């Protein structure tokens, strides 16, 4: 089903950006302002059934014209008011038009399905610059196992993740996304005389992303069923005693943090200059998408891997942040959930994994056989 047919099925009279611009232009002509403003990219707001047409002058957004999608009339209550637009038009200083640059077509990645076995901070160096189109991963938890510590210090853990974030920035295409599943971790108390600690890992990682050249885009919350967090033991003392100050909620959410490789280009640039219009069209998302940043997904269990994330989580991220035939990178591949979702959605993948045991799981799960390149 085409996007236009989708709009028609909703009862929209306005079904394209071209129509929205024409209606907005007629409105400006009535105000004698048609030569004062240009239009940004119109966007449809299917929650309120309106089109929003940005008004731009001297490179800055001045206001917007809001059009009722079902009646094709101007929504005067939501649009920028006429006196305001007239006042802004008087302030506009016209500058010579910039020479239109030659359109750059973004080339297709040369990579095929690939497994890199070894420490990802090192194996990622084998990949060419700007050769992947999306990074999605869930890094190992910091010292989550009570029987031993995997890292000498928390700083050592952050240093490892910084090196991976930095190398991913190099291999990620301009303006594309790095999506990471991460959550605060609970360090159990060593004795009855010590308190447990909860470390806010997502907020420390945010600082690393910003310092390494990414732009923060979104925070999504993966919501699990209510009973999912009781295994941590958090909240049991309060549940028994009910004393103030002891309250600790049971955590049933994890963060999905979305970053974009910093660029001066709008996201629309990545869409308009894509090498395959067919892939862009085939990647369009239907009406059953997640409307909010609360994603309710049941946790997954895999007896062969202690910390897998659900297939549904990988499926959503790949669908929302990549096109068909894109290359999806997971630097901490684990059992290969990201690879399986990538294949099912018509994408390619590059998986980094240090464990031979999990490499075998990925090979088994993707069922690609000889079509899968493995580099040690």
From Swiss-Prot:
One of its GO terms (molecular function) is N-methyltransferase activity. Its EC number is 2.1.1.113. Keywords: DNA-binding, Methyltransferase, Plasmid, Restriction system, S-adenosyl-L-methionine, Transferase. The keyword DNA-binding applies. GO terms for cellular component: cytoplasm. It catalyses: a 2'-deoxycytidine in DNA + S-adenosyl-L-methionine = an N(4)-methyl-2'-deoxycytidine in DNA + S-adenosyl-L-homocysteine + H(+). InterPro entries: DNA_methylase_N4/N6, MeTrfase_CN4_CS, RM_Methyltransferase, SAM-dependent_MTases_sf. Disruption phenotype: Loss of methyltransferase activity. GO terms for biological process: DNA restriction-modification system; methylation. Belongs to the N(4)/N(6)-methyltransferase family. N(4) subfamily. This is Type II methyltransferase M.CfrBI. It comes from Citrobacter freundii. The gene is cfrBIM.
């Amino acid at each position: 089903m085409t996007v236009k047919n989708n709009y028609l099925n909703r009862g929209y009279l306005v079904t394209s950006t071209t129509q929205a611009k024409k209606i907005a232009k007629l409105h400006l002509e009535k105000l004698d302002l048609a030569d004062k403003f240009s239009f940004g990219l119109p966007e449809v707001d299917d929650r309120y059934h309106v089109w929003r047409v940005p008004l731009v002058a001297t490179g800055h957004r001045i206001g917007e014209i809001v059009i009722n999608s079902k009646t094709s009339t101007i929504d005067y209550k939501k649009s920028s008011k006429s006196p305001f637009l007239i006042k802004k038009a008087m302030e506009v200083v016209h500058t010579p038009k910039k020479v239109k640059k030659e359109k750059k077509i973004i080339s297709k990645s040369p990579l095929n399905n690939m497994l890199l076995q070894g420490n990802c901070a090192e194996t990622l160096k084998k990949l060419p610059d700007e050769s992947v189109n999306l990074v999605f991963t869930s890094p190992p938890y910091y010292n989550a196992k009570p029987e031993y510590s995997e890292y000498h210090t928390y700083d050592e853990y952050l240093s490892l993740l910084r090196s991976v974030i930095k190398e991913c920035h190099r291999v990620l295409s301009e303006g594309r996304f790095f999506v990471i599943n991460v959550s605060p971790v609970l360090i159990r108390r060593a004795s009855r005389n010590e308190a447990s600690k909860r470390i806010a890992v997502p907020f420390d990682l945010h600082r690393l992303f910003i310092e390494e050249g990414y732009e923060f885009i979104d925070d999504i919350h993966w919501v699990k069923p209510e009973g999912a967090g009781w295994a941590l033991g958090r909240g049991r003392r309060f549940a028994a005693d009910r004393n103030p100050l002891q309250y600790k909620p049971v955590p049933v959410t994890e963060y999905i943090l979305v970053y974009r490789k910093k660029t001066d280009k709008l996201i629309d640039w990545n869409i308009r200059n894509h090498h395959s219009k067919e892939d862009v069209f085939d990647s369009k998302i239907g009406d059953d998408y997640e409307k909010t940043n609360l994603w309710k997904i049941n946790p997954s269990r895999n007896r062969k891997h202690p910390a897998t994330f659900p297939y549904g989580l990988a499926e959503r991220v790949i669908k929302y942040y990549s096109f068909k035939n894109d290359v999806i990178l997971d630097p901490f591949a684990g059992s290969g959930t990201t690879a399986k979702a990538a294949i099912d959605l018509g994408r390619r993948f590059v998986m980094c994994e240090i464990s031979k045991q999990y490499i075998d799981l990925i090979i088994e799960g993707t069922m690609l056989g000889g079509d899968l390149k493995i580099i040690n």
